[in-house]
């Protein structure tokens, strides 16, 4: 993995920084693990925009990822590492002893030809998946389940990891990168190591078109709109909006908490660190 800064041959190339992976497979994905992916343009079944700033972009296929890691006791070999357009992390194609192939989220330092396995008896090494009760305190983990058997829901993006800091009764305590401390049931599974492609946040797309290739449309400022479109719209000449920043629907937009309390709040021992 390396960061490649482009030569300033054009205004778009001047600011571009790419993450280059020399070791990944350049061919087509494994056909049996690929599904059609339809673009919505941010519209729902009534044709109304429910998510703004989505539309266009390169046509993609969805890679079916094994988040459950439930092939206990069967050794798997890393056949190749691949790029996945649907996520920031790299993925690895695993070929199991029984002939089945599955994609998993590739951890850092996982190499082609390495062997991985799942289950309570698996050794503590990168890429292996175990229940939290079988993982030593202090271990770095990723792809963590929130309910036993449901499949990994936490720590799946590029460079993500958490640390197992305590085990007490039926709950284990995890420290996340955000500073949050959270309790998870000890029967939930996690994968050893940190997610690959940790330099993803250092890339710079360089030009607007690179965003459009990814299906991201422009974000227009509220003060540049008309009064019918946004609370900050209108006015003669350039204005500051005339009020505290709000969303197009009138809700405060700078630091206003929108998350409603849930019964799962009881599992959050300490909240995220304030910036």
Swiss-Prot record:
Gene3D superfamilies: 2.30.30.30, Nucleic acid-binding proteins (2.40.50.140), Ribosomal protein L2, domain 3 (4.10.950.10). It holds the Pfam family Ribosomal_L2_C. It comes from the Bacteria. Keywords: Ribonucleoprotein, Ribosomal protein, RNA-binding, rRNA-binding. SUPFAM superfamilies: Nucleic acid-binding proteins, Translation proteins SH3-like domain. The keyword Cell wall biogenesis/degradation does not apply. GO terms for biological process: cytoplasmic translation. One of its GO terms (cellular component) is large ribosomal subunit. Disulfide bonds: none annotated. The keyword rRNA-binding applies. One of its GO terms (molecular function) is transferase activity. Residues 223-260 are annotated as: Disordered. InterPro entries: NA-bd_OB-fold, Rib_uL2_dom2, Ribosomal_uL2, Ribosomal_uL2_bac/org-type, Ribosomal_uL2_C, Ribosomal_uL2_CS, Ribosomal_uL2_dom3, Ribosomal_uL2_RNA-bd_dom. Part of the 50S ribosomal subunit. Forms a bridge to the 30S subunit in the 70S ribosome. Belongs to the universal ribosomal protein uL2 family. One of the primary rRNA binding proteins. Required for association of the 30S and 50S subunits to form the 70S ribosome, for tRNA binding and peptide bond formation. It has been suggested to have peptidyltransferase activity; this is somewhat controversial. Makes several contacts with the 16S rRNA in the 70S ribosome. NCBIfam families: rplB_bact (TIGR01171). This is Large ribosomal subunit protein uL2. It comes from Legionella pneumophila (strain Lens).
């Amino acid at each position: 993995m390396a960061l490649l800064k482009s030569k300033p041959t054009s205004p778009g190339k001047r600011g571009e920084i790419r993450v280059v992976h020399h070791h990944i497979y350049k061919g087509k994905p494994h056909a049996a693990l690929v599904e059609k992916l339809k673009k919505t343009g941010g519209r729902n079944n009534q044709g109304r925009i429910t998510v703004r700033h989505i539309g266009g972009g390169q046509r993609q296929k969805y890679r079916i990822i094994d988040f459950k890691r439930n092939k206990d006791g069967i050794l798997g070999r890393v056949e190749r590492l691949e790029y996945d357009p649907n996520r920031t992390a790299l993925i690895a194609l695993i070929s199991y002893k029984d002939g089945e192939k599955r994609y998993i989220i590739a951890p850092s330092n996982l190499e082609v030809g390495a062997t991985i396995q799942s289950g309570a008896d698996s050794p503590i090494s990168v890429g292996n998946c175990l229940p939290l009760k079988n993982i030593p305190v202090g271990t770095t983990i990723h792809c963590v389940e929130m309910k036993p058997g449901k499949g990994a829901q936490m720590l799946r993006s590029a460079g993500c990891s958490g640390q197992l800091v305590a085990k007490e009764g039926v709950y284990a305590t995890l420290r996340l990168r955000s500073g949050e401390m959270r309790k998870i049931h000890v029967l939930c599974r996690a994968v050893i190591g940190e997610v690959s492609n940790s330099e993803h946040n250092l890339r710079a797309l360089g030009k607007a078109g690179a965003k459009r290739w990814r299906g991201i449309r422009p974000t227009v400022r509220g003060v540049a709109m008309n009064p019918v479109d946004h609370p900050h719209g209108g006015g003669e000449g350039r204005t500051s909006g005339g009020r505290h920043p709000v969303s197009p629907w009138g809700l405060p937009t700078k630091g206003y908490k929108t998350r409603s309390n849930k019964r799962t709040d009881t599992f959050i021992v300490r909240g995220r660190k304030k910036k």
